[in-house]
Amino acid sequence: MTYNRFKRFIVSIIPGFMIRFLARPYVAGYCMEDAIEQARLFDEKGILSTIDILGEDAKKESDITLALERYKGLIDAVASEFKDNKPTISMKPSNLAVGRETQKGLLIDKKKCMRNVEALIKYADKKRVEMSLDMENHFWTDLTLDIYEILLKKGYTNTGAVLQSRLFRTEKDIKRFKNLKGRFRSCIGIYNEPEDIALQKKPLMKVEMFRHVNQLLHAGHYVEIATHDKRLLADIFDDLLTAKKIPSSRFEVQMLMGVPRRLLQGKIMIGRFRSYIKPVRMRLYVPFAYSRKDATAYCRRRLMATPDIVDFGAKNFLWNLDHTIMRPFRRHR
């Protein structure tokens, strides 16, 4: 068993409160105000953010009503609290219609889901707030991209979507949007998917992500490059952005809140990373939850997908232990 597999095994069996503790730096809190405050702190440092309400899969109509209210409340808060450089908001289609995942695919009222998504996009557009359709597991990929295509054809420009490099289908999905101009986040993806539809090894996923970023840029889309991998970023910056003279207005780099990449982020932001000498927008993912259950589910998936975060969490724990428990003893040496 490799070290990363061992960490995934540990993550799969430890209780929820420990999961939340290890992943504490990666969740803004348990109310909207916590996320807004975190986004404001990033804004003061020149860092953009995207806010996400954790939780998915509406089980009944009241869940949908609540999700609509919460998304509208978040849109209102972003519009009122930020004059410039407003955070974007990530939204999940599974919160906006009751769906059931079956062997034959997703059973859902697609028209109702579309109506609810469009209502939020229209509401956000009036408030000048940008939205993103978050990507969930493979059951939701078709519906999410169908909705995004309809929104683009209707002329909405305040919406983006996500493409995952682990899925075999992604190159075909990119070709689908060749005659439209959209905003796409290119990432590996957090959901472990079956081997008949997805790559299983991270190095191959990173190779595919490089290709997908290239294809998206070539097609004229705005690309959100979502990775912490310094080597992958170096390849993208050297062989794509610099070599093809891509202006910084065509892309941005996205990372998770809490992952220790401050030096790398700083170099990218001031135009000192590799041979690309222009300042680049940096956006951090700011998730928050209204319940510990939703936070635990996200944190466990995140730790499983990125085992290195377990190491970061352990270091954070030891740092806190050193600065809270050991500090009184140092004073009396």
Protein language model annotation of sequence segments:
Residues 1-333:
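Positively charged, amphipathic and often flexible ligand-engagement surfaces
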